[in-house]
C-alpha cells in the first residue's frame, strides 16, 4: 500500500474507512432510499457461472486487508443484463464487457466515501486496465452529467470512462438481488459477466491487497 495517493487524497483516510467496512459489512456506505425501478438483474445461470463460483472460493483468501469486506458469491449469478449509459448517453449492458474481468462500482458525487474512493479506482484502472480487466464506475447522480463530469475533472480522474444511470435503476436492480445496500457498492465479475464477489462500502483499490485480488481473479 502506498503512503501517498496518486491523485493527492490521503491513503490513511481510505484505510480507516475500508477497515470499518471490513468489520461491519457496508457500515461505511452511504445508504439511499430506493427510488424508481430497477433494470436487468441477475439471470438463472446454473451451468454458465459454475467457474465463477469456483473462482470466488479460490480467491477468498485474497480478500483481506484493504479488501477484506469483499464477500464471495454464494450462488451462481449472471449479471450481463444490468444496464446503464456510456459517455455518449448510449445504452450499454454488462454484456458489452464480455471477455473482460470487470470491477463494477456504483458511485455518486453526493456520496463522501465514493468521492474519496474514486482516485483509488482511477489508479487501479491506470495500473491494471487492459484487454483482460476494466474498472467500470457507474455514476448514479440524478439530473444531467454536469456534476459528475466536473468532479472527475477536478480530482484528476482521467483513466475511468464516465458511465451513467440518472434513473438509479442500476442500483435498484442490484438492491433487489441483495447485492447493494448503499454507496459505494462494488462487484467483481468474471469475463462472462458472472458474479465473483461483492462489497458494500469503500476500499483502497490502489492497494497491494486490491491488486492481488484482481490478479487472482484474472489468473495472473
Ranges and model annotations:
Residues 1-78, 220:
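N-terminal targeting signals for export/organelle localization
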Residues 71-76, 81-102:
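A short beta-strand-turn-helix
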Residues 77-79, 97-99, 130, 143, ...:
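Extracytoplasmic
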Residues 98, 106-123:
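Conserved redox-active cysteine motifs that mediate thiol-disulfide chemistry
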Residues 101-102, 133, 184:
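Alpha/beta-hydrolase fold active-site loops
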Residues 104, 136-138, 187:
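Conserved hydrophobic packing residues within short motifs/helices of P-loop NTPase cores
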Residues 115-156, 166-174, 212:
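Structural microenvironment flanking redox-active thiols in thiol-disulfide oxidoreductases
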Residues 150, 154-159, 165-217:
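Thiol/disulfide oxidoreductase modules built on the thioredoxin-like
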Amino acid at each position: 500500500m502506498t503512503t501517498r495517493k496518486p491523485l493527492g487524497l490521503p491513503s490513511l483516510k481510505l484505510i480507516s474507512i475500508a477497515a470499518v467496512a471490513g468489520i461491519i459489512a457496508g457500515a461505511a456506505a452511504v445508504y439511499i432510499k430506493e427510488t424508481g425501478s430497477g433494470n436487468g438483474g441477475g439471470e438463472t445461470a446454473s451451468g454458465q457461472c459454475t467457474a465463477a463460483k469456483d473462482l470466488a472460493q479460490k480467491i477468498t483468501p485474497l480478500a483481506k486487508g484493504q479488501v477484506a469486506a469483499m464477500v464471495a458469491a454464494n450462488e451462481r449469478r449472471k449479471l450481463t443484463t444490468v444496464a446503464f449509459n456510456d459517455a455518449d448517453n448510449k445504452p450499454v449492458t454488462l454484456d458489452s464487457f464480455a471477455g473482460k474481468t470487470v470491477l463494477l462500482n456504483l458511485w455518486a458525487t453526493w456520496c463522501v466515501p465514493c468521492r474519496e474512493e474514486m482516485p483509488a479506482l482511477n489508479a487501479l484502472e491506470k495500473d491494471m486496465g487492459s484487454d483482460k480487466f476494466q474498472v467500470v464506475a457507474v455514476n448514479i447522480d440524478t439530473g444531467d452529467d454536469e456534476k459528475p463530469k466536473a468532479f472527475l475533472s477536478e480530482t484528476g480522474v482521467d483513466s475511468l470512462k464516465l458511465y451513467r444511470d440518472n434513473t438509479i435503476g442500476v442500483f435498484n436492480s442490484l438492491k433487489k438481488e441483495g447485492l447493494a445496500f448503499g454507496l459505494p457498492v462494488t462487484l467483481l465479475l468474471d469475463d462472462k459477466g458472472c458474479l465473483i464477489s461483492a462489497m458494500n462500502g469503500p476500499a483502497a483499490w490502489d492497494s497491494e491487497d486490491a491488486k492481488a485480488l484482481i490478479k487472482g481473479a484474472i489468473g495472473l
